[in-house]
């Protein structure tokens, strides 16, 4: 919150779900359910009815020679919603970067929402400002900024690249918070999960453990920080 410059609006800490990854936590935010309930414990999830590991974002088999999509939509029984979340999406604006807004996953979890995309933070701000000033009555907007997550994975959460990006994002959010105060609007700003730095010394490579590899019925699922092993 310090780098973002949001101390004035800070209200306290909340805890992420487990696994504390983007796939699990964003799905929890949009479904109102825990990962155990909604069924997505990681980007790479094993589904029995296809007998394969699926990358849920593009809805592709993880290990496939032609890298083709399994279908044009995710079956309803793959991701579960609370009744409240399902109703909320019917009056929701979903705002995501243009490279994410039309993915099969995004379309599924925002099935009934008005989906819009943005190319930069000016467009991001303009869309939300228009939403807050609009005469639409009671409504809800979900807006996602992935760049802190992306840069933290690449450079580390304490890197200069992350700090510079956070300052730009903070400026955008502070402007929107001030507009919200004038338009009877509440804004909740939160991360979907946190970060813990790791090192190569503390990273286990399965290639170095052939006995363990021989026990696996499938390649590891989930994600590196929370991997799931299906064993023979």
Protein language model features and the residues they cover:
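Feature captures the catalytic ectodomains and active-site-proximal regions of enzymes
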Residues: 1-232
């Amino acid at each position: 919150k310090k780098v973002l410059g949001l101390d004035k609006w800070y209200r306290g800490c909340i805890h992420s779900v487990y696994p504390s990854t983007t796939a699990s936590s964003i799905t929890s935010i949009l479904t109102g359910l825990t990962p155990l309930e909604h069924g997505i414990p990681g980007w790479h999830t094993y589904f029995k009815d296809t007998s394969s590991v699926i990358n849920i974002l593009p809805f592709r088999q993880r290990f496939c020679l032609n890298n083709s999509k399994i279908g044009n939509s995710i079956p309803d029984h793959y991701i579960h919603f609370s009744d409240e979340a399902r109703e909320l999406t019917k009056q929701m604006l979903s705002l995501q970067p243009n490279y994410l807004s039309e993915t099969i996953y995004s379309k599924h979890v925002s099935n009934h929402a008005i989906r819009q995309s943005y190319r930069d933070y000016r467009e991001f701000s303009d869309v939300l400002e228009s939403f807050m000033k609009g005469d639409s009555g009671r409504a809800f907007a979900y807006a996602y900024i992935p760049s802190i997550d992306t840069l933290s994975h690449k450079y580390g959460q304490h890197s200069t690249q992350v700090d510079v990006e956070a300052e730009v994002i903070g400026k955008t959010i502070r402007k929107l918070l001030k507009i919200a105060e004038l338009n009877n609007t509440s804004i909740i700003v939160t991360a979907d999960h946190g970060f813990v730095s790791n090192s190569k010394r503390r990273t286990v490579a399965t290639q170095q453990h052939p006995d363990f590899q021989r026990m696996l019925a499938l390649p590891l699922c989930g994600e590196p920080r929370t991997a799931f092993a299906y064993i023979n």
